[in-house]
């Protein structure tokens, strides 16, 4: 009888310890910050090296087609005509289909005139896939940064900014300064 009572009490203590361990894991997860955001109202601020939509400056382009040659899928479409009077190419149109683009950044890296650059824009959804084919006019528009949008609360520090320090200043604006340690 006493041996049975000892076994029962040992099993009860072991069970309580296992339940306590599980409860401690639950409490540990409750103290963590949220890993989700309320998307339309809160937006993540991408890192400095984020590869978003490509920005194109028509006036800088010399129609060398390096971007087409280095693209793994030959995506940019460059239309140009040879100007005999100036003895050089003149760009007529430039377009990129973001429905096909893999955002590798080769075109930006190898462009000799730096007329291509990556923006922080990641909202490229459309109801029709043909709307994702951006011509040189659409590529030239710079997106409105989410950090400056008064209707959106930017979210910092969910893995996009490594050493961000969030400080509250006048009003309800959130400013991030990066420490250089």
Swiss-Prot record:
Q: Which cofactor does it need?
A: [4Fe-4S] cluster
Cofactor binding mode and count? Binds 2 [4Fe-4S] clusters per subunit.
Q: Which NCBIfam families match?
A: ndhI (TIGR00403), NuoI (TIGR01971), PRK05888.1-3 (NF004537)
| Gene label | ndhI
Q: What does this protein do?
A: NDH shuttles electrons from NAD(P)H:plastoquinone, via FMN and iron-sulfur (Fe-S) centers, to quinones in the photosynthetic chain and possibly in a chloroplast respiratory chain. The immediate electron acceptor for the enzyme in this species is believed to be plastoquinone. Couples the redox reaction to proton translocation, and thus conserves the redox energy in a proton gradient.
Q: Which reaction does it catalyse?
A: a plastoquinone + NADH + (n+1) H(+)(in) = a plastoquinol + NAD(+) + n H(+)(out); a plastoquinone + NADPH + (n+1) H(+)(in) = a plastoquinol + NADP(+) + n H(+)(out)
Record domain 4Fe-4S ferredoxin-type: where? 52-81, 92-121
Say if the entry is tagged with keyword Translocase. Answer: yes
Q: What HAMAP family does the record point to?
A: NDH1_NuoI
Question: What assembly does the database describe for this protein?
Answer: NDH is composed of at least 16 different subunits, 5 of which are encoded in the nucleus.
Q: Which UniProt keywords apply?
A: 4Fe-4S, Chloroplast, Iron, Iron-sulfur, Membrane, Metal-binding, NAD, NADP, Plastid, Plastoquinone, Quinone, Repeat, Thylakoid, Translocase
EC number in record: 7.1.1.-
Q: Where in the cell is it found?
A: Plastid, Chloroplast thylakoid membrane
Q: Which family does it belong to?
A: Belongs to the complex I 23 kDa subunit family.
Q: Which GO terms describe its biological process?
A: photosynthesis, light reaction
Q: What is this protein called?
A: NAD(P)H-quinone oxidoreductase subunit I, chloroplastic
> Which residues are [4Fe-4S] cluster 2-binding?
71, 101, 104, 107
Q: Where does [4Fe-4S] cluster 1 bind?
A: 61, 64, 67, 111
What is the organism of origin for this protein?
Zygnema circumcarinatum (Green alga)
Got a GO cellular component term for this one? Answer: chloroplast thylakoid membrane
Q: Which SUPFAM superfamilies match?
A: 4Fe-4S ferredoxins
InterPro entries associated with the record: 4Fe4S_Fe-S-bd, 4Fe4S_Fe_S_CS, NADH_quinone_OxRdtase_chainI, NDHI
